[in-house]
């Protein structure tokens, strides 16, 4: 255990001088004496000086304070003791329910599983959300991204997925709140508590108001806890909200460390940092990690370097669209932009595949006809096109669905629709079985039976 002293403080970046024969390694955790602060070594500047990032507030620190090297990376509690608890980036409890009482701690920096250890699978994960199950089905052990700008419903969709999957799925879940609103973290905790699944969830928060060090590392803390459950042979769900804030924290840290910015001001190590995180989120022969990540899209620009880098790592992408949200259709998932590797007849079967592609074809054709309708009106279309437009409008409305987590806001009770019912409903609309029903009947309902019942009342 070597000890050094603080020589410079610039915001969240602290330089510490050690004797030259005992300089800490990169990623070593250092403890400031007489303070609760933990520092993580980022650079060795030479002459025994290391540059570190503070995991927490730097208020009250001053030059000359003694700092001890722990000789290891930041470690966090893992295993069953973390379930039902809320922790910070260092694994300290923040739910005022006493110590964690863990039997084991793991370092947050770990190697990704080797190629030989990894396992792939094609088993589908049913979400109960029609548009997702139909157009961009999730794979068990896969990685999913929820892309969307500000206020189009990423967190609400994430909450609904957690409710539907975590409650229907009996395994363990880990939720990492990265740079998001504390209120949402609080809502989420109570949602889990009220649903009686809190004893199966570990919660790790590094919220918006925290220093960049916390936001940069909290995703790794959550991932480490998920890896432990996976290595014990469990199927784990890992929820990250929001992966963009992880990138943003990296940008802040990179600037403070004096690196040259690259495109749009992002850190030059953007792709590497994203890879380090994403490559660890994988399924092995022991167990699986299914991850669902919310991805904020700055200014609704999907070509921004941050979302563009994230795209490369995902098996399924759920793109939320402001245009669809403005029509009042929620969830505002864009069925033409959203993709999934599972959308393959060999994986999901011909029936599902043809229905999904049929829905996409009808919606794409409707999109093309919109210009003609806007200029010349519906009457100028051929009979076949008129029929297609009517079906497209029904499909568009049938893609909406009332959510369980939004019940308190909408007053409508939530609906869980099985994959079988979803396929049957859309197939019926495509085949013209419901051409006689008004399009309003399809808006904000669960299965197709509900639409038929609703039509009787209109």
UniProtKB/Swiss-Prot annotation:
It is found in: Cell inner membrane. One of its GO terms (cellular component) is plasma membrane. Gene3D superfamilies: 2.40.10.170, Bovine Mitochondrial F1-atpase, Atp Synthase Beta Chain, Chain D, domain 3, P-loop containing nucleotide triphosphate hydrolases. It is a peripheral membrane protein. Its EC number is 7.1.2.2. It catalyses: ATP + H2O + 4 H(+)(in) = ADP + phosphate + 5 H(+)(out). SUPFAM superfamilies: C-terminal domain of alpha and beta subunits of F1 ATP synthase (SSF47917), N-terminal domain of alpha and beta subunits of F1 ATP synthase (SSF50615), P-loop containing nucleoside triphosphate hydrolases (SSF52540). ATP binds at residues 148-155. Keywords: ATP synthesis, ATP-binding, Cell inner membrane, Cell membrane, CF(1), Hydrogen ion transport, Ion transport, Membrane, Nucleotide-binding, Translocase, Transport. Pfam families: ATP-synt_ab (PF00006), ATP-synt_ab_N (PF02874), ATP-synt_VA_C (PF22919). One of its GO terms (molecular function) is proton-transporting ATP synthase activity, rotational mechanism. The keyword Zinc does not apply. InterPro entries: AAA+_ATPase, ATP-synt_VA_C, ATP_synth_F1_bsu, ATPase_a/bsu_AS, ATPase_alpha/beta_chains, ATPase_F1/V1/A1_a/bsu_N, ATPase_F1/V1/A1_a/bsu_N_sf, ATPase_F1/V1/A1_a/bsu_nucl-bd. Produces ATP from ADP in the presence of a proton gradient across the membrane. The catalytic sites are hosted primarily by the beta subunits. Belongs to the ATPase alpha/beta chains family. F-type ATPases have 2 components, CF(1) - the catalytic core - and CF(0) - the membrane proton channel. CF(1) has five subunits: alpha(3), beta(3), gamma(1), delta(1), epsilon(1). CF(0) has three main subunits: a(1), b(2) and c(9-12). The alpha and beta chains form an alternating ring which encloses part of the gamma chain. CF(1) is attached to CF(0) by a central stalk formed by the gamma and epsilon chains, while a peripheral stalk is formed by the delta and b chains. This is ATP synthase subunit beta. The lineage of its organism: Bacteria, Pseudomonadati, Pseudomonadota, Gammaproteobacteria, Pseudomonadales.
